[in-house]
UniProtKB/Swiss-Prot annotation:
InterPro entries: DUF503, TT1725-like_sf. The gene is ylxP. This is Uncharacterized protein YlxP. Coiled coil: none annotated. It holds the Pfam family DUF503.
């Protein structure tokens, strides 16, 4: 089972694209190191306070994949500098 989550977020403290990318890189790197998922920025790459990223997880069951994605989203929510506004989930 493949689970995919697309998240749109606001980065309030980013005053430039450079600051946005520094915050985003730190978060994405920590997610990749802690969880067995793929994550990448997929939208709003030239907008300095908004971002959209995709997270993909693969496992043998939907329940396990859903739990992994929920843990990743909770971990992302623990960062005070980013606020998740919209999340869409798909299953393949």
């Amino acid at each position: 089972m493949i689970g995919f989550a697309e998240c749109e977020c606001i980065i309030y403290d980013a005053g430039s694209l450079k600051e946005k990318r520094a915050v985003l890189k730190r978060i994405l790197t920590r997610v990749q190191n802690k969880f067995n998922v793929s994550i990448s920025e997929i939208g709003y790459q030239d907008t300095w306070q908004r971002t959209s990223f995709g997270i993909a997880a693969v496992s043998s069951s939907r329940v396990q994949t859903e739990k992994e994605l929920q843990r990743v989203l909770a971990f992302i929510d623990s960062f005070p500098e980013i606020e998740r506004t919209i999340t869409r989930t798909e299953w393949f």
